[in-house]
Amino acid sequence: MPILSKASYLFTTFITVASLNIQAQNPSENLPVPLNEAQITARFAELALECVHKEYPNIIKHMMRSDDDVQTPKLLYPAFYGCFDWHSSVHGHWLLSRIAHMHPETVHFERIINSLDKSFSEANLAGELAYFERSDTGTSFERPYGLAWFLQLTSELREWDHPKAKEWLAILHPLENKIIANISDWLPKLSFPIRGGEHSQTAFAFGLMLDFSEAANNRSFKALVETTVLRLYENDINCPLAYEPSGQDF
């Protein structure tokens, strides 16, 4: 390290330590009181509970071939219409499942159970599956980000020892199978990785897919994802870190 840089580092460290010491000796009455874990967990639960069944505002990706195809988000996606878009709704439901699983003592536990029960009805998931079976948009819909988060959701339900989790997982299972089939059909056709810092980035999605393959003990899907990861990334060298960050990163 150059002398100037080292000196600057030592000076910055000294100022930081001194500032902390002054604050310790003269605590300000205006400093916010840190939230504890239960309060933070409750706040995250509240954010998800407020949005999973809030239909608008909303942005949808939906191909329309005629006036008959014009539909509201709730009609298009009966289970995952809230939280502004499909994938945000999915990981909002994952968040609720995760909180109820890991923190059953949360004050919002019953609200979470009721909210998930409202979303994960057989009728709602039949509607979701019908959308994925559309030949025009269903095969590429929410690929890969939303699909990976859906698999993370079902992974959470598998790991949660609660009667409702097992019930919901059974209802979600047909859509899970369809999503696995769509991904499995797509991966061999993917010639290059998607490296941008947005939802389409493949490395992040592959990580969630591998998590799912472990939770579901789906060896064939795991092998396919691992083969794809090696094919697309194994020979990567000299990653241009100087190009980061990008103005389009999410």
Cite the ranges covered by each PLM segment.
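Extended ligand-binding groove/face enriched in aromatic
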Residues: 75-78, 82, 90, 97-209
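Low-complexity, Ser/Thr/Pro/Gly-enriched N-terminal "stalk/linker" regions
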Residues: 26-81
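Positions within ordered alpha-helical repeat solenoids
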Residues: 50, 54, 98-101, 156-159, ...
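Metallocofactor- and cofactor-centric catalytic cores in central/energy metabolism, strongly enriched
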Residues: 87
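Boundary at the C-terminal end of the N-terminal hydrophobic targeting segment
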Residues: 22-24
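Loop-centered beta-sheet repeat module
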Residues: 179-249
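Bacterial N-terminal signal peptides that target proteins for export
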Residues: 1-10
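Bacterial N-terminal signal peptides
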Residues: 9-19
